[in-house]
């Protein structure tokens, strides 16, 4: 099963290497990885996607919690969460198809961010399945020159009570 694991760790040299080393040593695969500082500049957040049974994921979380730089570890897929990924696509488009392709991009929730005479670069932020469909659909009307995906990011949802209070 696919899992999104969020790891907060000290923003120090070697911290990411230790996390990656844990996965490598134990033979676990990282499907996607994103790392950035949090609102606290001394703490970074790693969001990674991996696959495994519940017992394997529990073992991964347990081992991650033992690493010296790790502040917290959470399997986001264990609760309600929102997941997003960014994709950038460089498209070569024939002039007679440009309006149709541009229209599809907008209807799908994407944006043309760099138009050119022979194509454009587009972006879409969505979940993995929506991005997969977007890429396949665009490949029908345009030539995909380059596809760049960020990998998944995940955040736990607010509780229902907290959402109602905010409204």
Where is each model-derived feature located?
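Long, contiguous binding/interaction regions
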Residues: 1-4, 8, 12-44, 49-167
């Amino acid at each position: 099963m696919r899992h999104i694991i969020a790891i907060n760790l000290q923003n120090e040299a070697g911290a990411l290497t230790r996390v990656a080393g844990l996965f490598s040593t134990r033979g676990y695969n990282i499907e996607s990885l994103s790392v950035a500082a949090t609102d606290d500049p001394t703490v970074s957040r790693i969001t990674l996607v991996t696959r495994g049974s519940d017992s394997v994921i529990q073992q991964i979380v347990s081992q991650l919690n033992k690493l010296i730089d790790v502040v917290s570890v959470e399997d986001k897929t264990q609760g309600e969460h929102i997941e997003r990924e960014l994709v950038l696509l460089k498209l070569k488009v024939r002039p007679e198809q440009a309006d149709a392709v541009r229209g599809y991009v907008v209807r799908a929730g994407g944006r043309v961010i760099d138009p050119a005479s022979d194509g454009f670069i587009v972006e879409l932020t969505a979940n993995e399945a929506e991005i997969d469909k977007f890429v396949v659909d665009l490949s029908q009307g345009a030539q995909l020159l380059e596809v760049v995906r960020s990998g998944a990011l995940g955040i736990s949802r607010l509780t229902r009570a907290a959402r109602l209070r905010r409204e």
